[in-house]
Amino acid sequence: MAIDLNRLRANFHVAVAKRKRADQLTLLGKSDAKLPSSPANARLETFPNPAPKRNYRIHFETDDFTSICPVTGQPDFARIDIDYVPDRLCVESKSLKFYLASYRNERAFNEAVTNHILEDFVKACRPREVIVTAQFSARGGIALTVRAEYPDKE
């Protein structure tokens, strides 16, 4: 039985590279991780896209989003949907959960929050395209939905 040393070396290097990428994820599998106090302290973690040559969509959604109205100080509740086509990197979902939770004490208008989420998402993973939709619960009888897209449509 002949052993292909080149193939063995290649498999070893692939396994080491995968382990290094997994080691870079600081939240996944860690039950003692603390929520960041603000979006500025939060970090969206990424991992390599397993199919970078294919256009496919990833959809995240949560109805557990809260930020603070900058005028009244009252909480604004929202459903956040993020739909994106990854390029080289994908966003790890637990880091996204922690990132979104970091807005709980953030005073900002709904439009600013939605656009900031989009900007941070694009900065983290440089997707081919992404749409962030934030459906804020009614306050004063009016519900508000904000949709921000990348790349900008002309």
Each model region followed by its residue ranges:
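N-terminal intrinsically disordered, cationic/polar leader segments
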Residues: 2-154
